[in-house]
Amino acid sequence: MTKHFISKALENMDRFGGSFVQSLAVCYRKADPDNQTILYNAFEHLFFKYVKFKDD
């Protein structure tokens, strides 16, 4: 997990995600590093989904 990976995933979560995923992106940005790790570990599948997301 790199900063670029997280940044791209969050950008796509904001742009293409539903209300839950958009809220998760907001929470992640506001969280301290320990809580960011908790959120990432709990929702890793969503981070991977949105880092690869293409609007075709």
Task: Give the ranges of each region predicted by the language model.
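N-terminal acidic leader/helix
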Residues: M1-C27
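Short, charge-rich amphipathic interface segments used for partner binding and complex assembly
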Residues: V21-D55
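Short intrinsically disordered terminal tails
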Residues: M1-H4, K52-D56
